[in-house]
Swiss-Prot record:
Residues 133-177, 248-266, 312-313, 391-392, 457-466 are extracellular. The keyword Membrane applies. The gene is AAP4. Induction: Down-regulated by drought. It is found in: Cell membrane. Keywords: Amino-acid transport, Cell membrane, Membrane, Symport, Transmembrane, Transmembrane helix, Transport. This is Amino acid permease 4.
């Protein structure tokens, strides 16, 4: 039976409904994916590097991220860039172009990165909850009570919330979640920027130095470690490559998806870099050598304290949902592996229906899912309580994800996809870029781990108060 020609207009070449994304929707998705809690540590990062190296390094990272993103956009289709087989995710592209072994390595790095991000988000959320409590306590006491408190109860509160949310299957697919995340991230970032500008105006002077935090405020060794760690913090702020292919999969064609995506990447990187520059530089200008690891906590108990409360509440709301966005892929992977290995186990595969008053459909409970997901959240919470160092964790995450996910795999896929000849000028330049970024990742990782070790010397697990 012949299918009427107009019917084809509803579907793309892979049989899926026709994609409708444009340059502007793709740009919006990228900006939403990039701007997040990483913006909070940029003032500290610039503070370690100074007025010359800080903005220069940020521009360098933005260029590398943009260039590697253009390489990755050419890998959306395997083979022919216009009519080749589509890759729906970053992992699909790695498996299709580079093959099984590197696919497994990429998966391991990606899941480690996701796990680390859930730990970082637990720490960041607890800091913001504690900041709200301390702010109100300080003002209620008229400034007489320093309101020292432990972050542990707030981490536990966050953990309990995540245990409940983690039982909702495919929570990360809820349509309004990304909208709420975008609104919240722009809210706290904009408030941080505005308060930085206000603080600079109140100081009447731009603080900071050309070379960053001065020797004396820290030792020579600490200066080196902090400089390295700052690279990791900036790298974390630009970590979005793993979602680029998925964003590209929403773009319509013609023109070719890669062409649209390159324009969208250029727009979004320009916008986010400008925003990052403003937030980081204004934070450093406001606090100088005392620029805090988390920008919003640096404003302490300044008025308007209610505005800081709004910003910190926005962080908590954002991170409650963002935790699930990063945890759910790990849940799905582990549960898929368990089902494949134990297909006949009721513990793994059987679902029990529970009727909940007020809901039409029964809630389906799987014993393995309930226990495993709860255990995962407990583990991330305990690790956060053992190492509640936001800056150090962000630096480690930036180091872990930047070179392999943002540079190495896109470069290798592009070389394979475009059949770039070994030892040609282009091949050599791409390998030099990859090696240079590997060095940055290594020193950032070393600096961040050194930061953790230094913090652990004075930190008593489960006992330290702020």
């Amino acid at each position: 039976m012949d299918v009427p020609r107009p019917a084809f207009k509803c579907f793309d070449d892979d049989g899926r409904l026709k994609r409708s994304g444009t340059v502007w929707t793709a740009s919006a998705h990228i900006i939403t994916a990039v701007i997040g809690s990483g913006v909070l540590s940029l003032a500290w990062a610039i503070g370690q590097l100074g007025w010359i190296a800080g903005p220069t390094v940020m521009l360098l990272f933005s260029f590398v991220t943009y260039y590697s993103s253009t390489l990755l956009s050419d890998c959306y289709r395997t083979g022919d860039p216009v009519s080749g087989k589509r890759n729906y995710t970053y992992m699909d592209a790695v498996r299709s172009i580079l093959g099984g072994f590197r696919f497994k390595i990429c998966g391991l790095i990606q899941y480690l990165n996701l796990f680390g991000i859930t730990v970082g988000y637990t720490i960041a959320a607890s800091i913001s909850m504690m900041a709200i409590k301390r702010s109100n306590c300080f003002h209620e006491s008229g400034g007489k009570n320093p309101c020292h408190m432990s972050s542990n109860p707030y981490m536990i509160m966050f953990g309990v919330t995540e245990i409940l949310l983690s039982q909702i299957k495919d929570f990360d697919q809820i349509w309004w979640l990304s909208i709420v995340a975008a609104i919240m991230s722009f809210t706290y970032s904009a408030i941080g920027l505005a308060l930085g500008i206000i603080q600079v105006a109140a100081n009447g002077v731009v603080k900071g130095s050309l070379t960053g935090i001065s020797i004396g405020a820290v030792t020579q060794t600490q200066k080196i470690w902090r400089t390295f760690q700052a690279l990791g913090d900036i790298a974390f702020a630009y970590s979005y490559s793993v979602v680029l292919i998925e964003i590209q999969d929403t773009v319509r064609s013609p023109p070719a998806e890669s062409k649209t995506m390159k324009i969208a990447t250029r727009i979004s990187i320009a916008v986010t870099t400008t925003f990052y520059m403003l937030c980081g530089c204004m934070g450093y200008a406001a606090f100088g050598d005392k620029a805090p690891g988390n920008l919003l906590t640096g404003f302490g108990f300044y008025n308007p304290f209610w505005l800081l409360d709004v910003a910190n509440a926005a962080i908590v709301i954002h991170l409650v949902g963002a935790y699930q966005v990063f945890a759910q892929p790990i849940f799905a992977f582990i549960e898929k592996q368990a089902a494949a290995r134990f297909p006949d186990s009721d513990l793994v595969t059987k679902e029990y229906e529970i009727r909940i008053p007020g809901f039409r459909s029964p809630y389906k409970v799987n014993v393995f899912r309930a226990v495993y997901r709860s255990g995962f959240v407990v583990l991330t919470t305990v690790i956060s309580m053992l190492m509640p160092f936001f800056n150090d964790v962000v630096g480690i995450l930036g180091a872990l994800g930047f070179w392999p996910l943002t540079v190495y795999f896109p470069v290798e896929m592009y070389i394979r996809q475009r059949k770039v000849e070994r030892w040609s000028m282009k091949w050599v330049c791409l390998q030099m870029l990859s090696c240079g970024c590997l060095m940055i990742t290594l020193v950032a990782g070393v600096g961040s781990i050194a930061g953790v070790m230094l913090d652990l010397k004075v930190y008593k697990p489960f006992k330290t108060t702020y």
